[in-house]
């Protein structure tokens, strides 16, 4: 790994790790704060710097960008995006990866599983930590974590499992119960034991594991202790019948006594190092500090008068998301459906 790559990875880990800290400038080399990245000028300068390092360090990326454009970009908007399918065909990394995370895909190259070669786990932890602390652990002093996401010691190539491991390391987490096995599935008895305690529970789960838990509990109720909250992520991936999100949350409220305001949806992809959340556990929209979600400004649209405020996913300020025309990759106006293009500075 070149010194340029090592340097930029270290700087990004310091910068992103400072998000939400009292003193965001934690190193002399950091001349901007995470909040500055909400402004296009600061975001653009850092994006172009990362692009230059990647172009210099990865011949495959250099050939791709030369073939797609050829011109030196003057703005991050001019950098040709990497298609998701590329993660199934070639390793996209600058230097030697510390970890390789794999998707759960079932078709395509290399067995259909995309691979994200991550050069720095410190960067991944720094990227994830401020975000999940803001949205899942705000106001928490002590909590028990019950994970229906696999233990990262058991499933080593899952970015989601690794993030669950990061959360388990937080000082507020008094105990962690790994209640999902890739072979046997959800450990309902472990969830029952957690419900009998007095500490509030942070339940981390995929959507299909949550449905399996509710199905196993049947018509019975298993109220979690007051202050409990749930992070739900992912779709159903064909493992269970699709369930309307509103109906699922109502069922959770009836069975686990966790209201909608304490159920937070996390949006992530193996191909991205950053995550988006649609609310703060305990009430409130996704953190206002996460302003980089939609470069076009269409955060789900404006609510009609008298209607509830829509819950919209927000990334941290080092991510921009654009809706592009699938045929031309030209940006679309606000409100138009298109191909989502995430520009994540953590994908260095």
Go through each PLM region and give its residues.
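The conserved Walker
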Residues: 107
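Active-site diphosphate/adenylate-binding microenvironment
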Residues: 41, 53-102, 110-117, 130-139
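Active-site glycine/GP-rich loop and adjacent strand/helix microenvironment
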Residues: 2-19, 41-53, 142-144, 151, ...
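Anionic, Ser/Thr-rich low-complexity intrinsically disordered regions
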Residues: 5-20, 24-30, 34-39, 81-83
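Short, hydrophobic/amphipathic alpha-helical packing segments
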Residues: 58, 125, 129, 207-210
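Long, hydrophobic, well-ordered secondary-structure blocks that form the structural core
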Residues: 114-157, 161-174
